[in-house]
């Protein structure tokens, strides 16, 4: 019988500067939103609202919204979770399966329920205190992925809850909700001496390799776009930006992209430092080809899981 969750690693050997570039790109660009826009609608449990919202914020939602990875990473889509659960004599706990899960199309604000794997019944979130007929505990809450804009249009789509209660409770907490995009990286990634390693979790109910490909394709496309948009100032060196003086051959490195690209072509640079280097050695298209080849190598390694 296949275990529902397995920890694995995907390892590829790359040129060290390129491996570092991919690792840093992953950590800075591949951002999976947390459920930090949370609203408790009704709570008679022994856990206070803040405890519920903290627990829900960090639900591992990628294993639920796995069919929508690319559009969530590009922020074309968001998601929400909704829980309404009462204690009973024979049902005294809450699992992730008790939530309903919805995808949000940010263009139309449409809200669509997604299927949830039965394996979520194995993930415990809360245990109620001893059941008493006259004081049964109930919790109702909703939480949106970070970056979701809460407006009248999207609220009107929440037909499964009492909109008046939602508006009242949301107005009570919206000033303390972090307005910044709050996220986490889907995996831990390291690259010691060019050994690029992804520490991943594989679940039995969906095709991890397809999901991992969505992530790497997103990363590659975003990195290539960033390379094309990257600029190095030419002229007198300016310590506020990466800059190169062709007359002296001096390069000032002030960002990670410049550092990794010039290191790929033989420089031994560090951030916020000067280096004598011939920038004519840098071939951006050659670097992009090496990046694309590395991404193919990563996907090939993932297919061996």
Swiss-Prot record:
The UniProt record lists the EC number as: 2.7.7.6
What is this enzyme's catalytic activity, as reactions? RNA(n) + a ribonucleoside 5'-triphosphate = RNA(n+1) + diphosphate
| GO terms assigned for molecular function | DNA binding; DNA-directed RNA polymerase activity
Cross-referenced Pfam families, in alphabetical order?
Pox_RNA_pol_35 (PF03396)
List where in the cell it is found. Virion
| Main subcellular localisation | virion
Q: What class of enzyme is it?
A: transferase
Cellular component GO terms held in the UniProt record: DNA-directed RNA polymerase complex; virion component
Question: Mind listing the GO biological process terms from this record?
Answer: viral transcription
Role played: Part of the DNA-dependent RNA polymerase which catalyzes the transcription of viral DNA into RNA using the four ribonucleoside triphosphates as substrates. Responsible for the transcription of early, intermediate and late genes. DNA-dependent RNA polymerase associates with the early transcription factor (ETF), itself composed of D6 and A7, thereby allowing the early genes transcription. Late transcription, and probably also intermediate transcription, require newly synthesized RNA polymerase.
Please describe the quaternary structure of this protein. Answer: The DNA-dependent RNA polymerase used for intermediate and late genes expression consists of eight subunits 147 kDa, 133 kDa, 35 kDa, 30 kDa, 22 kDa, 19 kDa, 18 kDa and 7 kDa totalling more than 500 kDa in mass. The same holoenzyme, with the addition of the transcription-specificity factor RAP94, is used for early gene expression.
Protein name (Swiss-Prot/TrEMBL): DNA-directed RNA polymerase 35 kDa subunit
Name the gene for this chain. OPG156
